[in-house]
Amino acid sequence: MQVHFLTKNFGKYDTSSIGSYMNVGGFEALRKAVTMDPEKITDLLTKVKIKGRGGAEYPLGRKWSQARAVRGERKVVICNADEGETTTFKDRELICHDPFNLSEAMIIAAYVVGASDGFIYMRAEYACYRPLLLNAIRQAKNYGFLGTNILGRGFDFDIHLYSGAGAYVCGEGTALIRSIEGKAGRPRMKPPFIKVSGVFARPTCLNNVETLSLVPHLLLDDAGVYASCGSGESIGTKLISVAGNVNRPGVFEIPFGTTVREILYDLAGGIQHDRKIQLIQFGGASGKIADASILDTPYTYEDLRAAGVMVGSGGMLVIDERTSVLDFLRMNQEFFWEESCGQCTPCREGNLHIKIILDKMAAGTATREDIAIMIKIARVMSMSSLCGLGETAQNTLMSAMKVFPDLFDIGGARA
């Protein structure tokens, strides 16, 4: 079933008017937050076990506590709105349908961690939503929710909107920061970690759109009721985007524990023309794949992990029987070959050579040795690449080897 906690404001107010937002309770969470000790807010987030919704699953309360504890002046909070993962478009819906909530969430984050500046880093392809966020920021300033001495609490904070240039790798934290600084969007070595030295060498706290957008709702609504959704490691609700060969692709808010079957057949309307499922990719291009045997698995962090896939970015791509697994793998690999920034050798060369071997498989000229080399390259990439792009680029391929082993069983004639 679909629920409306994070999405409860969708369609309820005029997204161009702060007054309309305030009529549905807008900025009441901020008013409440500035009367609370910041530690009380992080304690609440820790108590309800909120994890980051960007894919890393890092506990939000712990992240904000660590950011607050870092010494340094002029701290920064960043909203990662560079939603570049393929088949993932849930954050776009939050920006489009609830822009003032995102602004409010960033102000609360700044209050908690002690930041004076914020950046929203928006992917280039979302340029049409830039005026919507700029308007929300401008009106928040006019009403005294941004600027100096916010709500008379001696708290100063401003938000700056920055658009990327279309590079997938800028979804990675350090590459995103270098892009904001006006440099080439390429990852850097860690440490120093960005919580200590991030944008312009200032302590930085980075969260994605969905993670931030949860906070105002948790402060105003009964966090205990929210925490009663889901179980174990997976608390609350999750925004997911479903794409591919389904009848009703779109974004849905589900309670953790909803089965994959319920998502695809009850919410997304089933597979087009009742065709068979060839594969489902979870978490975008860097995610893993499964076949139809996963349908009755609950959508939770732990259950999907046990099934060999992951929540990741919250994207689900459904491919029906008309598309061959090999063609899908080649398309996925082409994406990483094009999007690698080229800075580190394992990712730059590894993606190219995996692409070459997959093309040889399609042409019927691959050998057993080619398959062995491809596996070795994939493992080296996962262990030695500079950033998450190279580390996870082989996830789809390696999971396909487990789900479709016959595809990689090259006959002895070409060995």
Question: What are the language-model segments listed below?
Answer:
Residues 130-256, 268:
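Hydrophobic alpha-helical positions that pack around
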Residues 47-67, 164-178, 182-184, 337-349, ...:
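Conserved phosphate/anionic-ligand binding catalytic regions in large, soluble enzymes, centered on
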Residues 98-112:
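Histidine-anchored nucleotide/phosphate-binding helix
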Residues 28-44, 73-75, 81, 90-95, ...:
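Ferredoxin-type iron-sulfur electron-transfer modules in oxidoreductases and energy-metabolism complexes
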Residues 105-109, 256-274:
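Short amphipathic, charge-patterned alpha-helical segments
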Residues 21-26, 79-91, 194-199, 241-246:
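Gly-rich Lys/Arg/Thr-decorated short loops/hinges at beta-loop-alpha junctions or inter-strand turns
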Residues 56, 62-64, 88-91, 130-135, ...:
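Short acidic, glycine/serine/threonine-rich loops at helix termini
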Residues 1-42:
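Cofactor-/ligand-binding subdomain signature composed of acidic, glycine-rich
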